[in-house]
Swiss-Prot record:
Keywords: Isopeptide bond, Membrane, Phosphoprotein, Transmembrane, Transmembrane helix, Ubl conjugation. Belongs to the PRM5 family. The gene is PRM5. This is Pheromone-regulated membrane protein 5. Signal peptide: none annotated. Residues 276-285 have a biased composition (Polar residues). It comes from Saccharomyces cerevisiae (strain ATCC 204508 / S288c). Residues 238-318 are annotated as: Disordered. Residues 238-247 have a biased composition (Low complexity). The chain crosses the membrane at residues 75-98. Residues 250-261, 309-318 have a biased composition (Basic and acidic residues). It is found in: Membrane. It is a single-pass membrane protein. Induction: Expression is regulated by the cell integrity signaling pathway and by pheromone.
Length: 318
């Protein structure tokens, strides 16, 4: 560092004096101007220094709380957060795709089931329906078509044959009810009224589901309800069992009595009244008087009782 030393020079002094002459004052003025112009300026040099401290992180050796981020790229936090958000989005998208595909398959299967269930092309006794198991279908066909050995001329009891023939004839209208689509019957009944009952709709769906569940069992063991509220199968089984036992004993009179027993059991009080010889005259008198029999009307149930019976599946005769 060089230090410049400046020697001080003497500066002229300004003296003022009063004199009567102007020459002296002017000369002094000139002298002062020359002396002031000949003076040199002072040079000054100054240096400033500042201390900046450097931060040194502690060593990670032996310190488990310091993460070594030297090998990690910049923006690691943003990469981790973006990856987690992307995984969540992909999981939601995958769940949506799976649920949509499963609901689509379920809808297609339900549509195929309804189209095959309610179509009239492949409903010949539900023989071509894929929803009916083959053992039930074979048993149903075996029960519908009676073998010729049961109606062969070798049978001695003609009444048994007549009962079996009537059994087959009575099965035809019952089977035709299964052939008819159920949805059309419900829609025709709904056209008669503009009132829509939610309770009736729930009851209809419940009965329809029960019918779907019980249709193979009904087809496997068909039960034909006659006008006397007696099963024809029980009638035929009673006749066949009684006739077989009577034929083994060789007593033909007991056969006729056994045949008459179901008729007595199935006969209603009105039929007993009509079949009795004492009631012939009363029946003729009633017809001549214009059928004066008055049936006592039943008291209509209350709305709450009607809804309870409807939900329980009980049908009331009007």
């Amino acid at each position: 560092m060089t230090v410049i030393t400046i020697a001080k020079r003497g500066l002229p002094k300004l003296t003022t004096s009063t004199s009567s002459t102007t020459t002296a004052s002017s000369s002094s003025t000139i002298t002062s101007v020359a002396s002031s112009s000949s003076s040199l300026p002072l040079l000054s040099n100054s240096t400033s220094s500042s201390i900046i401290p450097s931060i040194t992180p502690p060593s990670r050796n032996g310190n488990p709380y310091i993460l070594d981020s030297g090998d990690m790229p910049n923006g690691t936090v943003f990469i981790v957060v973006g990856g987690i958000a992307g995984v969540i989005f992909l999981a939601i998208l995958l769940w949506w795709v799976i649920t949509t595909y499963s609901s689509h398959r379920l809808t297609r299967s339900v549509q195929d089931y309804e189209s095959k269930m309610f179509s009239t092309q492949h409903t010949q006794f539900y023989g071509d329906s894929p929803y009916m198991d083959y053992p039930a279908k074979e048993n149903f066909q075996d029960q519908v078509h009676i073998s010729e050995s049961d109606i062969s001329p070798g049978n001695k009891d003609e009444s048994v044959k007549d009962a079996l023939v009537s059994h087959t004839n009575n099965e035809k209208p019952f089977l035709s009810n299964f052939e008819r689509p159920l949805f059309s019957l419900a829609s025709e009944s709904n056209r008669n009224s503009l009132f829509i009952s939610p309770t009736g709709d729930i009851l209809y769906k419940t009965r329809l589901s029960k019918l779907y569940q019980e249709s193979p069992r009904l087809l496997q063991k068909p039960v034909i309800m006659t006008s006397d509220n007696v099963s024809t199968n029980s009638l035929v089984s009673t006749i066949s069992s009684s006739s077989a036992s009577s034929l083994d004993n060789g007593n033909e009179k007991e056969v006729g009595e056994d045949i008459r027993k179901p008729a007595k059991i199935a006969s209603s009080p009105s039929r007993k009244l009509l079949n009795s010889p004492e009631s012939d005259g009363s029946v003729n008198r009633n017809h001549s008087k214009g059928n004066l029999l008055v049936v006592q009307s039943k008291r209509k149930p209350t709305p709450s009782t009607y809804l309870e019976h409807m939900l329980e599946g009980k049908e009331q005769d009007e």
